[in-house]
From Swiss-Prot:
Protein's UniProt name: UDP-glucuronosyltransferase 2B23
Signal peptide start-end: 1-24
Residues the record marks as carrying a glycan: 67-68
Transmembrane segments: 494-514
Record PROSITE patterns: UDPGT (PS00375)
Family annotation (InterPro entries): UDP-glycosyltransferase, UDP_glucos_trans, UDP_glycos_trans_CS
Reactions this protein catalyses: glucuronate acceptor + UDP-alpha-D-glucuronate = acceptor beta-D-glucuronoside + UDP + H(+)
NAD as UniProt keyword: no
Family: Belongs to the UDP-glycosyltransferase family.
Gene Ontology CC entries for this record: endoplasmic reticulum membrane
Entry EC number(s): 2.4.1.17
Length: 529
């Protein structure tokens, strides 16, 4: 047989192998904003590898347009909440979160709690709209999906996985106080050296900082999400027709893919069914648009500064915009500022405003000297990947923590958005640009980020395919999920051992008393004789 025909037969065999054995069907409970950006990167790679991906999204979803052509299949389910109203709620609640008073612990977190409860009610209604839609549920059941993929910060996917009896893979950045990670995933975060997320602490804590960390942990564990989780418990119990809890159903997840990495996160124990996939969006820079490239090149040896506060921040107050613009006008670098609003009066000739910028491509440009960021995880990972020091102006959620982590690593300077002056911003930029330590530190983080045997995206895809191939990954799931809280902490064993010790001590004491009584009685009898 000729080499030509041998090659043809081998290709045919390979095509049969990949078409029949390797391609799976993935059901996705869609997320919003940056959560969806990360998930979409994984899903597009799955499609490239021949898998069929169906994203389940509500008619109110902000990022989904069913008319847009996409490799992903979009299954839109109707909901009573109109899209413009949902978008307005998100905008208003995020604005409210940003403006919360940060100087009072109880006031800040109690109001943040109300915001989370409001979103919880909305997403619970979305979930009700899905499971009550018999036609849709029948269609999904008949599709015979191999795995459900979701971000657990938007609950419901675990209910679908339970109803359809299929494996579940999570992709998560964090939940406030690590509540879902600990209560549902069984993660370990010893408060003695692992700072609670949103505490802005490092892993090198003083005694009083450990006290603060413990207070944060107790608050998040016993107060923050309890009310909302009980609502989910009740809803899941009604749907499944048996008593259950959100923690129990979420705890059945086969794999947790955490969008973090060890050059970003402080070290802590990990379970076998947990893997880090931080930096999914990091990639080599592409050429800039012609007009933008010309502006960057015009900066000469001074280089450029990239500035963005993210896609969720619009209509910045005029006073704050002018303070920032005034500061940027005082530096020798050219500035590319992602800004959606009226042009500030103090805008300098060295600054250009854009409604959108190719952030990754700009950060990867050799003339970029610094990155002014709100501290979103995606932006920080891109800055680390390309080795760009940062000036952090965190606004809400995990952003203060993210910047605090970079500050601890010596890769960033942190400012307060509400109180910073033009001088503060100028000095911060001069520090990260002119002090070589910041560049050295972020380059060290960059080398660590790039020095991985398997890329984060490939690891994420591997685990999803692994779960599809093996119909789950229960062999990696710790038995801790099957224990009650007192069994998990061995309180029953400790109680039993204490009871045994107490019994032995009691018997010894009784024997001693009996012997003492015997000897005392014998002594009295001898004296009387």
């Amino acid at each position: 047989m000729s080499v030509k025909w041998t090659s043809v037969i081998l290709l045919i065999q390979l095509s049969f192998y990949f078409s029949s054995g390797s391609c799976g069907k993935v059901l996705v409970w869609a997320a919003e904003y940056s959560h969806w950006m990360n998930m979409k990167t994984i899903l597009e790679e799955l499609v490239q590898r021949g898998h069929e991906v169906t994203a389940l999204a509500s008619s109110a979803s902000i990022l989904f347009d069913p008319n847009n052509s996409s490799a992903l299949k979009i299954e839109v389910f109707p909901t009573s909440l109109p899209k413009p109203e949902f978008e307005n709620i998100v905008t208003q609640e995020i604005k409210r979160w940003i403006e919360l008073p940060k100087d009072t612990f109880w006031l800040y977190f109690s109001q943040m709690q109300e915001i989370m409860w409001k979103f919880g009610d909305i997403f619970r209604n979305f979930c009700k709209d899905v499971v009550s839609n018999k036609k849709l549920m029948k269609k999904l059941q008949e599709s015979r999906f191999d795995v459900v993929f979701a971000d657990p910060i938007f609950p419901c996917s675990e209910l679908l996985a339970e109803l359809f009896n299929i494996p579940l893979v999570y992709s998560l950045r964090f939940t406030p106080g690590y509540v879902f990670e600990k209560h549902c995933g069984g993660f370990l975060f010893p408060p003695s050296y692992v700072p609670v997320v949103m505490s802005e602490l490092s892993d090198q804590m003083t005694f009083m900082e450990r006290v603060k960390n413990m207070i944060y942990m107790l608050y998040f564990d016993f107060c923050f999400q309890i009310y909302d989780m009980k609502k989910w418990d009740q809803f899941y119990t009604e749907v499944l027709g048996r008593h259950t809890t959100l923690s129990e159903i979420m705890g059945k997840a086969d794999i947790w893919l955490i969008r973090n990495s060890w050059n970003f996160q402080f070290p802590h124990p990990l379970l076998p069914n947990v893997d880090f996939i931080g930096g999914l969006l990091c990639k080599p820079a592409k050429p800039l648009p012609k007009e933008m490239e010309e502006f960057v090149q015009s900066s000469g040896e001074n280089g450029v500064v990239v500035f963005t506060l993210g896609s969720m921040i619009t209509n910045m107050k005029e006073e704050r915009a002018n303070v920032i613009a005034s500061a940027l006008a005082q530096i020798p670098q050219k500035v590319l500022w992602r800004f959606d609003g009226n042009k500030p009066d103090t805008l300098g000739v060295n600054t250009r405003l854009y409604k959108w910028i190719p952030q990754n491509d700009l950060l990867g440009h050799p003339k970029t000297k610094a990155f002014i960021t709100h501290g979103g995880a995606n932006g920080i990972y891109e800055a680390i990947y390309h080795g760009v020091p940062m000036v952090g102006i965190p606004l809400f959620a995990d952003q203060p923590d993210n910047i605090a982590h970079m500050k601890t690593r010596g890769a960033a300077v942190q400012l307060d958005f509400d109180t910073m002056s033009s001088t503060d911003l100028v000095n911060a930029l001069k520090t990260v640009i002119n002090d070589p330590l910041y560049k050295e530190n972020v380059m060290k983080l960059s080398r660590i980020q790039r020095d991985q045997p398997v890329k984060p995206l490939d690891r994420a895809v591997f685990w999803i395919e692994f779960v599809m191939r093996h119909k789950g990954a229960k062999h990696l799931r710790p038995a801790a999920h099957d224990l009650t809280w007192f069994q998990y902490h061995s309180f029953d064993v400790i109680g039993f051992l204490l009871a045994c010790v107490a019994t032995v001590i009691f018997i010894i004491m009784k024997c001693c008393l009996f012997c003492f009584w015997k000897f005392a009685r014998k002594g009295k009898k001898g004296k009387s004789d």
